[in-house]
Amino acid sequence: MPKNILIFDSGIGGLSVFKDIRYQIPLAKYIYAFDNAGFPYGELTEDILIERTSYIIQKLCHRHKIDIVVIACNTASTVVLPTLRTLLSIPVVGVVPAIKPAALVSQKIGLLATPATIKRSYTFDLIKSFASISDVKLLGSTRLVEMAEEKMVGIPVNLIELDEILKSWKGQVDCIVLGCTHFPFLRKEIKEILGRNVLLIDSGEAIARRVKQLLGSVDANKGDHLFGEVYCSASTKNEEALNKTFKELDFNPLQTLGYPKSLDR
């Protein structure tokens, strides 16, 4: 039987991680879930983050025989991993900003993340541990997350707006850590604003290697074509556009998981 891999994010940015994992583990069954009712996670309290992610992930683990959970959200990963690892008996992998590899190639680093991620002590500990001699500039933006989501459903990125967000970094950084899984979908536009020579680094490939290591051998026939399942936490007006995106990635049509509690921000 193929392995069942659950990938979770607040939105569809986690598809950047899915693509890296599928490249290394093509013969697996993928379940992708996103909490669109709670989006964006960078604006939620830690208690609400833990409550929402725990409920949704446990529900899907009961529905599918999940072998490993990937929290494809930097904001959630800095908060929910200890709780999930207590609740579940299977491996739970999170994503963290790729500060360490960035520090190996540059001393003028920019960390681009959500407002929540750049404020967390975990992020400052990473910088202290792996980039203490580097000049690390921090920029947190919820709007960039929204722009990535919009791009994925066919809305062009507004380069004037993007330039306004990133302009303080022009000529100041030569390596940018994409500290949110949504941001790899904005690679082209970020380079248009900051220059083609700026190096962009994310955690996707490293996460994929870790998942492959934890899963071990994947028992599936090469001739098998496995369609993935995708869930959202609430109905969405973008369902048609999202289904087109997911179909191109070999997922079945979007299903609404439902979340019983209203979101109190």
From Swiss-Prot:
<keyword id="KW-0133">Cell shape</keyword>
<dbReference type="GO" id="GO:0009252">
    <property type="term" value="P:peptidoglycan biosynthetic process"/>
</dbReference>
<keyword id="KW-0413">Isomerase</keyword>
<feature type="binding site">
    <location>
        <begin position="41"/>
        <end position="42"/>
    </location>
    <ligand>
        <name>substrate</name>
    </ligand>
</feature>
<feature type="active site" description="Proton donor/acceptor">
    <location>
        <position position="73"/>
    </location>
</feature>
<feature type="binding site">
    <location>
        <begin position="74"/>
        <end position="75"/>
    </location>
    <ligand>
        <name>substrate</name>
    </ligand>
</feature>
<feature type="active site" description="Proton donor/acceptor">
    <location>
        <position position="180"/>
    </location>
</feature>
<comment type="similarity">
    <text>Belongs to the aspartate/glutamate racemases family.</text>
</comment>
<feature type="binding site">
    <location>
        <begin position="9"/>
        <end position="10"/>
    </location>
    <ligand>
        <name>substrate</name>
    </ligand>
</feature>
<dbReference type="GO" id="GO:0008360">
    <property type="term" value="P:regulation of cell shape"/>
</dbReference>
<comment type="pathway">
    <text>Cell wall biogenesis; peptidoglycan biosynthesis.</text>
</comment>
<dbReference type="InterPro" id="IPR001920">
    <property type="entry name" value="Asp/Glu_race"/>
</dbReference>
<dbReference type="InterPro" id="IPR015942">
    <property type="entry name" value="Asp/Glu/hydantoin_racemase"/>
</dbReference>
<keyword id="KW-0961">Cell wall biogenesis/degradation</keyword>
<dbReference type="InterPro" id="IPR004391">
    <property type="entry name" value="Glu_race"/>
</dbReference>
<dbReference type="GO" id="GO:0071555">
    <property type="term" value="P:cell wall organization"/>
</dbReference>
<feature type="binding site">
    <location>
        <begin position="181"/>
        <end position="182"/>
    </location>
    <ligand>
        <name>substrate</name>
    </ligand>
</feature>
<dbReference type="InterPro" id="IPR018187">
    <property type="entry name" value="Asp/Glu_racemase_AS_1"/>
</dbReference>
<dbReference type="InterPro" id="IPR033134">
    <property type="entry name" value="Asp/Glu_racemase_AS_2"/>
</dbReference>
<comment type="function">
    <text>Provides the (R)-glutamate required for cell wall biosynthesis.</text>
</comment>
<dbReference type="GO" id="GO:0008881">
    <property type="term" value="F:glutamate racemase activity"/>
</dbReference>
<protein>
    <recommendedName>
        <fullName>Glutamate racemase</fullName>
        <ecNumber>5.1.1.3</ecNumber>
    </recommendedName>
</protein>
<keyword id="KW-0573">Peptidoglycan synthesis</keyword>
<dbReference type="Pfam" id="PF01177">
    <property type="entry name" value="Asp_Glu_race"/>
</dbReference>
